[in-house]
């Protein structure tokens, strides 16, 4: 049986989670939502956010049977979330193909992308693709997003993931 894509994401306001919800059936993926980091050691609570998300116990076990791994996180003040960075400090991505989806107000976030890419590469991944997703449109607030906004962004990411999946055949 071929490996399935896995989306690992963090969502504080629900914008990233909504994109993931739309994306899941498009790429036939599973998803895991990262909880808030706890304690000084940055331990993670990874739990259910919807019926499609499965509860998992620890970061090392979750990626073995999946490929590619899609990492999605909001960008705040030009930086990826601390939750995603802390998660990447505790996971083995050796030889995994990784697609990074950054959700933010800007069309690009090179500083955030560079930090996330470096952290993923430190964990051994084969870095494949990135996509910048608009979580907020210029002059608007994240609460102004409509269904078509989420669909447009999910489609952008689905195209990137589909290209990675097609490349492996």
Segments predicted by a language model, with ranges:
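N-terminal beta1-alpha1-beta2 submodule of the flavodoxin-like/Rossmannoid cofactor-binding fold
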Residues: 1-72, 77-89, 152-169
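Hydrophobic beta-strand segments of well-ordered beta-sheets in folded domains
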Residues: 5, 96-100
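Secondary-structure boundary/capping motif
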Residues: 15, 79-80, 108-112, 142
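Short loop/turn motifs at secondary-structure junctions
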Residues: 65, 94, 126-127
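Charged helix-capping and loop-helix junction motifs
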Residues: 83-87, 112-118, 146-147
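Short, conserved loop/helix-junction motifs that constitute active-site signature segments
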Residues: 89-96, 121-123
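Short, glycine-/small-residue-rich phosphate/pyrophosphate-handling segment
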Residues: 99-137
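A charged, well-structured terminal subsegment
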Residues: 126-169
């Amino acid at each position: 049986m071929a490996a399935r894509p896995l989306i690992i994401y963090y969502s504080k306001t629900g914008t990233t989670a909504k994109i993931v919800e739309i994306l899941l059936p498009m790429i036939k993926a599973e998803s895991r939502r990262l909880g808030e980091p706890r304690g000084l050691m940055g331990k993670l609570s990874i739990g259910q956010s919807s019926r499609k998300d499965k509860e998992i116990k620890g970061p090392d076990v979750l990626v073995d049977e999946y490929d590619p791994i899609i990492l999605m996180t909001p960008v705040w003040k030009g930086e990826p979330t601390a939750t995603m960075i802390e998660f990447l400090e505790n996971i083995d991505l050796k030889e995994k193909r990784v697609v990074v989806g950054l959700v933010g107000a800007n069309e690009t976030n090179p500083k955030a992308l560079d930090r996330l890419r470096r952290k993923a590469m430190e964990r051994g991944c084969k870095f494949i693709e990135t996509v910048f997703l608009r979580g907020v449109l210029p002059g608007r607030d994240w609460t102004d997003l409509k269904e078509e906004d989420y669909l447009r962004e999910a489609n952008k990411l689905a195209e990137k993931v589909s290209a990675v999946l097609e490349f492996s055949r």
